[in-house]
Swiss-Prot record:
Protein name per Swiss-Prot or TrEMBL: Large ribosomal subunit protein bL27
InterPro entries the record matches: Ribosomal_bL27 (IPR001684), Ribosomal_bL27_CS (IPR018261)
Region annotation (Disordered) ranges: 1-24
PROSITE patterns linked to this entry: RIBOSOMAL_L27
Domain of life where this protein originates: Bacteria
Organism: Nitrosospira multiformis (strain ATCC 25196 / NCIMB 11849 / C 71)
Gene: rpmA
Assigned GO CC terms: cytosolic large ribosomal subunit
Length: 85
């Protein structure tokens, strides 16, 4: 009877689905109002002129226009704004 009894099931073998975060529209792009610019966790990038922020910190365009990224202030704070077209 040279058999080994079955071991317990592994504790590994799980992973969460990717959340597809990141910049969706880049600097200089012309976009319509309502377009998502950035999906993020927390305010890595802050909303500037003509940009709104959703409850999950998603940044979106409030008006049609051109995307503009800037870094201002101390501490260096990234902001994204829309220059109306």
């Amino acid at each position: 009877m040279a058999h080994k009894k079955a071991g317990g099931s592994s504790r590994n073998g799980r992973d969460s689905n990717s959340k597809r975060l990141g910049v969706k529209r880049f600097g200089g792009e012309l976009i319509p109002a309502g377009s998502i610019i950035i999906r993020q966790r927390g305010t890595r990038v802050h909303p500037g002129e003509n940009v709104g922020m959703g409850k999950d910190h998603t940044l979106f365009a409030k008006v049609d226009g051109r995307v503009n990224f800037t870094v201002k202030g101390l501490p260096q704070r990234k902001t994204v704004s829309i220059i109306p077209a």
